[in-house]
C-alpha cells in the first residue's frame, strides 16, 4: 500500500513539474542576433533615404488621387 502511494505521489509530482516547466519555457525568448559575429549594422543611414523616397512618391501620387479645387 505504501509503495503504491509513493509511486502515485511521484507520478503526480513529475506531471506537475512537466506542466510548470512547459509553461515557463513559453515565456522565454532568445535575444536577437544583431550580427554579433559580423559586426552590427547601423540602419540610421538607410532610414533617411527610405523616408525621403517614400515622401517623394507620396508627393507625386497624392495630387493625382486627391485633386485640390482652388475655388475658395
From Swiss-Prot:
Disruption phenotype: RNAi-mediated knockdown in SIFa-expressing neurons causes normal male sexual activity towards virgin females but also vigorous courtship directed at other males and also leads to female hyper-receptivity with a dramatic decrease in copulation time. It also causes reduced sleep and shortened sleep bout length. Strongly expressed in two pairs of neurons in the pars intercerebralis (at protein level). Belongs to the FARP (FMRFamide related peptide) family. It is found in: Secreted. Residues 1-26 form the signal peptide. It comes from the Eukaryota. Residues 42-72 form a propeptide. Glycans are attached at residue 34. GO terms for molecular function: hormone activity; neuropeptide hormone activity; neuropeptide receptor binding; receptor ligand activity. Ligand for the neuropeptide SIFamide receptor. Modulates sexual behavior by negatively regulating female receptivity to male courtship and by playing a role in male sex discrimination. Also involved in promoting sleep. One of its GO terms (cellular component) is extracellular space. Keywords: Amidation, Behavior, Glycoprotein, Neuropeptide, Secreted, Signal. This is Neuropeptide SIFamide. It comes from Drosophila melanogaster. The modification Phenylalanine amide is found at residue 38.
Amino acid at each position: 500500500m505504501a509503495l503504491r502511494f509513493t509511486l502515485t505521489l511521484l507520478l503526480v509530482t513529475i506531471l506537475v513539474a512537466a506542466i510548470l516547466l512547459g509553461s515557463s519555457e513559453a515565456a522565454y525568448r532568445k535575444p536577437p542576433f544583431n550580427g554579433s559575429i559580423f559586426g552590427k549594422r547601423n540602419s540610421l543611414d538607410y532610414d533617411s533615404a527610405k523616408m525621403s523616397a517614400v515622401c517623394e512618391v507620396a508627393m507625386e501620387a497624392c495630387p493625382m488621387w486627391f485633386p485640390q479645387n482652388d475655388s475658395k
